[in-house]
Amino acid sequence: MSESGRTILAVNDDPAILSLFDDLLSEEGYQVVLDQFSRTTTDILNDIRRVQPDLVIMDFIIGGEGTGWQLLQAVRMDRTTRHVPVIVCTGAARQVEELSAHLDTMNVRVVLKPFDIDHLLEIVDLVWANAGEASRSE
């Protein structure tokens, strides 16, 4: 169950995936901001700083390179964005497995492509539930 007013920033190099995220998440009541991975990591990080989304959903491997991993590291190292929950939505199962300990430490959820839409929405809801628990413990 979504809450109106929450903003999700989706980052991907595939316009069809961005369109899917826009349609799916908007229908659930979220404000959706789309960011194409054709830009630099710095540009996308600046967008995340500017938008201050409640959640980032991003790809991991772009054009065979680990650009998503670089962006994730930048998000986690930046004091203005490190608090933003991240879901990595990727088809790069091998890379996810290799970096699973790092992803766990960074508190990053992973959804492997191809994904079931209901599963993605369950993970989004889980992120909101965990964010609520974290704010109650602060």
Sequence positions of predicted segments:
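Conserved sequence signature across two-component system core domains
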Residues: 11-12, 35, 56
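Two-component/phosphorelay signaling modules centered on CheY-like receiver
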Residues: 15-35
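Conserved phosphotransfer microenvironments
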Residues: 41, 59-74
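His-Asp phosphorelay/catalytic-motif detector in bacterial-type signaling
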Residues: 52-54, 80-85
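Alpha4 helix (beta4-alpha4-beta5 surface) of REC/receiver domains from two-component response regulators
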Residues: 66-70, 90-112, 118, 122
